[in-house]
Amino acid sequence: PQISRQEYGGLFGPT
């Protein structure tokens, strides 16, 4: 799905 990078801090999670 389309996930905002700012929500996760990255593409797959906070890196």
From Swiss-Prot:
The keyword Isomerase does not apply. Its EC number is 3.5.1.5. It comes from Morganella morganii. The keyword Hydrolase applies. Belongs to the metallo-dependent hydrolases superfamily. Urease alpha subunit family. Its main location: cytoplasm. Binds 2 nickel ions per subunit. It comes from the Bacteria. GO terms for molecular function: metal ion binding; urease activity. One of its GO terms (cellular component) is cytoplasm. It is found in: Cytoplasm. Keywords: Cytoplasm, Hydrolase, Metal-binding, Nickel. One of its GO terms (biological process) is urea catabolic process. Pathway: Nitrogen metabolism; urea degradation; CO(2) and NH(3) from urea (urease route): step 1/1. This is Urease subunit alpha. It catalyses: urea + 2 H2O + H(+) = hydrogencarbonate + 2 NH4(+). Its cofactor is Ni cation. Heterotrimer of UreA (gamma), UreB (beta) and UreC (alpha) subunits. Three heterotrimers associate to form the active enzyme. It is an enzyme of class 3 (hydrolase).
